[in-house]
Amino acid sequence: MKVKKGEIYLADLSDASGSEQGKVRPVLIIQNNRGNKYSPTTIVACLSSKIYAKHHLPTHCILPDGLGLKYRSMVMCEQIRVIDKSRLFKKIATLNKRQMAIIDKKIKISLDLRLHNPKK
């Protein structure tokens, strides 16, 4: 299956444990396209439609309406996992570059990645 960074798919995550996100749900592909091209797995961030029931974290990104999702949803950039591409079964939408730039910032917050600018 060919997938690209920024695409949203339905995925079967039914083997979740504890506080992991499970069941069939939308996920956002966050792995780079080189990895997506050559690997049988991909890296995803889970989406949730419970945007008002959850505590808002700096790693959450509410998605705009009109993407084809059944409910208004948010990307939970703290809920990242590697999945086999066979778990993906329906493409729903593709985020634009501006939206993905926001997601990338939220992932950096989640993983505590800081840009390092060495002095010249």
Model-based region annotation:
Residues 1-120:
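Conserved functional hotspots at enzyme active or ligand-binding sites that engage polyanionic ligands
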